[in-house]
Structures are given as structure tokens and as C-alpha cells.
């Protein structure tokens, strides 16, 4: 059992007889009395997203899952294909389950497959990935003084803000949890 206050986006729980992936968590605390945890849960059996509210201190059951090291191979527009690094077995995961992770997947990226009853139900990304900048504005003299950043599009289609010294063709390290620029690779 896990306390609802410890729920985080991406976790898997068993709730009302179904397994759900936590899509969003909002914690509201009142001046007096207990807090309220509002969640959005995606059912793995139906694919539907539902709202669930919990009182602070409530507990939910963690889903019994296993994890396998795998490598991303390719996608065909509907499914993303991964190869188990121990058995070399290939698994297809629907794009709806890959969700936002698709912006961090390039060929040969190593991930953890999330398995339930020997079937893949999702993926856990590495903390950082290296991606190439394919589109950004050119630098102008004096840009570095203003601070901040400029928009950039990466090879996977991800749009982020990067420092002014980053140019098209540069490889950068991106945090997969926040989607933010970390450093040049």
C-alpha cells in the first residue's frame, strides 16, 4: 500500500479492481483539516482517463509490476517497437501508451519496459537523453547579455527553450522528467 500523498505522475496503482497509470497529481492543503489529493488516472484496460479524489492519509494499492531492460527500435505510426535486451523478444506498445515519452525516443535508446502479467504496459525513460537541434533562431551579437533563451525544435519534434549559444546541429542533453535543456552533449 502507498499513501496517496506519495503518488507521482507515471506511477501505476491498483484502484477499484483495475490498474491505472497516474497521469496528473494535484495536492490541495487547507489551513485546517486534511488535504485533498486530486488525480487523473488512465485505465490500462480501457484507455479512458478518469478523475479520482483522495483525502490526505488514504492509501491505495501499488500495482504488481516487473521491469525489463529494452532498446527502442522503431515506430510504424501506430506502435512503438522495443527489444528485450536479455531474450531479444520484440514488443509493440501502442502510441497512446507511449504518450509524451515519444519525444525522447531515438533508435537504440535504452528504456525499462513496465510489464504486467508478462505484457508491456508502458516504459520508463532514462533520466536524460541526447538529442540534436534541428531548428532554432540564429544568434545575434549581444544576445548573451539578455539572459533567458530561445525556442528550439529537436529531432523528435520536441520544442524546448535553449541558451542563445546553441545552434542547429548541436547535440544537447535533455531532462526527460521536465523536458528542459541541461547542457551541451
Curated annotation (Swiss-Prot):
Molecular functions (GO terms): translation elongation factor activity
Record's keyword terms, sorted: Cytoplasm, Elongation factor, Protein biosynthesis
Keyword Protein biosynthesis (UniProt): yes
Pathway(s) per entry: Protein biosynthesis; polypeptide chain elongation
Superkingdom of origin organism: Bacteria
Subcellular locations according to the entry: Cytoplasm
Recorded GO CC terms: cytoplasm
CDD domains listed in its UniProt record: S1_EF-P_repeat_1, S1_EF-P_repeat_2
Entry function: Involved in peptide bond synthesis. Stimulates efficient translation and peptide-bond synthesis on native or reconstituted 70S ribosomes in vitro. Probably functions indirectly by altering the affinity of the ribosome for aminoacyl-tRNA, thus increasing their reactivity as acceptors for peptidyl transferase.
Family, as annotated: Belongs to the elongation factor P family.
Cited HAMAP family: EF_P
Protein name: Elongation factor P
Highest classification ranks of the organism: Bacteria, Thermotogati, Thermotogota, Thermotogae, Thermotogales
Amino acid at each position: 500500500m502507498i499513501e496517496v500523498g506519495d503518488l507521482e505522475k507515471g506511477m501505476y496503482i491498483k484502484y477499484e479492481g483495475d490498474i491505472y497509470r497516474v497521469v496528473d497529481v494535484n495536492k490541495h492543503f487547507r489551513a485546517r483539516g486534511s488535504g485533498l489529493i486530486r488525480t487523473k488516472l488512465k485505465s490500462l484496460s480501457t484507455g479512458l482517463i478518469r478523475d479520482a479524489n483522495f483525502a490526505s492519509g488514504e492509501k491505495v494499492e501499488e500495482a504488481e509490476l516487473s521491469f525489463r531492460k529494452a532498446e527502442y527500435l522503431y515506430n510504424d505510426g501506430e506502435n512503438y517497437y522495443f527489444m528485450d535486451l536479455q531474450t531479444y523478444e520484440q514488443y509493440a506498445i501502442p502510441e497512446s501508451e507511449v504518450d509524451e515519452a515519444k519525444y525522447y525516443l531515438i533508435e537504440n535508446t535504452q528504456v525499462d519496459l513496465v510489464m504486467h502479467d508478462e505484457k508491456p504496459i508502458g516504459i520508463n525513460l532514462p533520466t536524460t537523453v541526447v538529442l540534436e537541434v534541428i531548428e532554432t533562431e540564429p544568434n545575434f551579437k549581444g544576445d548573451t547579455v539578455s539572459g533567458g533563451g530561445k525556442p528550439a525544435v529537436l529531432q523528435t519534434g520536441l520544442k524546448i527553450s535553449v541558451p542563445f549559444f546553441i545552434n542547429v546541429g548541436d547535440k544537447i542533453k535533455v531532462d526527460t522528467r521536465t523536458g528542459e535543456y541541461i547542457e551541451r552533449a
